């Protein structure tokens, strides 16, 4: 398992927290000190916690489990979409719709509608409609794609959730908590770590830091899948050679 290093985190600026006046006392144990009224996160505490979270992700991926990537603030959305797509995991990058997990039955119906509209847009149905009706359906399709496009292939509730800014995604976390879905989350000095099972204390705003978290989690997913594949192939090879010998 390849691990994130202290140097990786320092280069990405993961140690810069928020202004001291905005701190959350629950994050006190992860704060090293302050510089120019900015809290500095103790990366000696973050590093093992981050690597523990990555190890958990790798194990989940090896077991063919689904991890939902969540990051809906503007600075994180594009990276969430790209990294989740790179490792073929579901994601929410635009807006968390209340009930996305706790009312999944309704969400599933909306996904079905999204698929119907996708088919209609490709099979010539839109071309047969009036201009107004075609425009309305196109708008519906775009709206559904923006909200649900990242989870349309999820096929059921995820086995874990990875969150970039825990304050921004508090509704998503509370839904996961209600359903017993483990939460991995980047928690900055102004946020509460409550409801997060795998806490990664770190800067949740700097683009380079966000890229490091997402890229590392996506890499852990790909590694886990690869290891699972290697294991299966090895077992099959052993079974085949034993059969040949028998």
From Swiss-Prot:
Family as reported in the entry's similarity comment: Belongs to the universal ribosomal protein uS2 family.
Listed GO biological process terms: translation
Gene of this entry: rpsB
Protein name: Small ribosomal subunit protein uS2
The entry's keywords: Ribonucleoprotein, Ribosomal protein
UniProt entry tagged with the keyword rRNA processing: no
Molecular function GO labels: structural constituent of ribosome
Keyword Hydrolase: no
GO cellular component, one term: cytosolic small ribosomal subunit
Transmembrane residue ranges: none
HAMAP family noted in UniProt: Ribosomal_uS2_B (MF_00291_B)
InterPro entries named in the record: Ribosomal_uS2, Ribosomal_uS2_bac/mit/plastid, Ribosomal_uS2_CS, Ribosomal_uS2_flav_dom_sf
């Amino acid at each position: 398992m390849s691990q994130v290093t202290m140097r990786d985190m320092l280069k990405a600026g993961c140690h810069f927290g928020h202004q001291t006046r905005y701190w959350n006392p629950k994050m006190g144990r992860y704060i090293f000190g302050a510089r120019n009224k900015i809290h500095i996160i103790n990366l000696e505490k973050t590093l093992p916690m981050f690597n523990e979270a990555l190890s958990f992700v790798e194990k989940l991926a090896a077991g063919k489990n689904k991890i939902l990537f969540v990051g809906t603030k503007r600075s994180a959305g594009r990276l969430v979409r790209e990294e989740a797509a790179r490792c073929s995991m579901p994601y929410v990058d635009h807006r968390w719709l209340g009930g996305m997990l706790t009312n999944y039955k309704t969400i599933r119906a909306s996904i079905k509608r999204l698929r119907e509209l996708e088919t209609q847009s490709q099979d010539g149905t839109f071309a047969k409609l009036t201009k107004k009706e075609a425009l309305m359906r196109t708008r519906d399709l775009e709206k559904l794609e923006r909200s649900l496009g990242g989870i349309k292939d999820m096929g059921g509730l995820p086995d874990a959730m990875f969150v970039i800014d825990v304050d921004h995604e508090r509704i998503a976390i509370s839904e996961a908590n209600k359903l017993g879905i483990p939460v991995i989350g980047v928690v900055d000095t102004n946020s509460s770590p409550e409801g997060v099972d795998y806490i990664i204390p770190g800067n949740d705003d700097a683009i380079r830091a966000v890229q490091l978290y997402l890229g590392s989690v996506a890499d852990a997913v790909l590694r886990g899948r690869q290891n699972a594949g290697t294991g299966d192939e090895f077992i099959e090879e052993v079974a085949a050679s034993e059969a040949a010998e028998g």
